[in-house]
Regions:
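An alpha-helical, amphipathic repeat domain used for nucleic-acid recognition
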Residues: 1-206
Length: 206
């Protein structure tokens, strides 16, 4: 493989274009040019060409990975699955995840806390938050730590607000039953729901 021309890209800063003898183009970084000692007229052996192609692929995956993780926080498991869907080899996906963890961009413990806080603000209970952490691939050993930040008074306020919104002053047993069922689906336990119903003015028997 012979590099016929090596020139800077007009569209992407710090990107270089290597035009090969067959007319194909390699998009390179400055580091790759230095690492492989590339210049116009340079002939690469098959082994060098393979290593260069692999280096380009690796850097492209890493650049895309950085954009993905800074745009949308994800768990490590979610992130690895997403990379694999982009045809990134599983071993390479794990390597990139390790790299992002070292940089501090991928942190399952912090992500678990964010998810717990988000769903608490949305008015969901602990059971629902656990389901969400499971769905997002957060390791189970991180769940309790994330849920510790949820205060009982926060749950109570969220349930009270939900009942006020749904019932709007109604004490009709059918309306109350529907609201109670909805709270259960949101992940609240019966003791929490019954306490809220008492605060609302309903007689409740456990």
């Amino acid at each position: 493989m012979v590099i016929e021309e090596l020139k800077p890209s007009k569209r992407v800063r710090d990107r270089w274009l290597a035009v090969l003898e067959d007319g194909s183009i390699l998009r390179l970084s400055r580091n790759q040019i230095a690492d492989f000692a590339l210049y116009a007229g340079r002939e690469l052996s098959d082994e060098e060409a393979d290593r260069l192609t692999q280096a380009i692929e690796n850097e492209n995956f890493r650049a895309h990975a950085l954009r993905m993780i800074t745009d949308t926080p994800r768990s490590r498991k979610e992130f690895v699955k997403l990379l694999e869907k982009m045809d990134c080899p599983p071993e390479k996906a794990q390597e990139i995840a390790d790299w992002l963890e070292d940089l501090g961009y991928l942190d399952d413990a912090a992500y678990a806390r964010e998810v717990a806080e988000l769903y608490t603000r949305k008015g969901y209970g602990v059971r629902k938050i656990r389901d969400e952490l499971y769905r997002r691939g957060v390791p189970r050993e991180l769940w309790d730590e994330a849920l510790e930040q949820i205060k009982e008074e926060d749950n109570a306020s969220a349930i009270d607000a939900f009942l006020e919104k749904k019932l709007r002053g109604s004490h009709d047993p059918k309306d109350v039953k529907r609201a109670s069922d909805a709270l259960a689906r949101r992940g609240y336990r019966w003791p929490e729901i019954s306490d809220a119903l008492r605060r609302y003015g309903m007689e409740v028997w456990d």
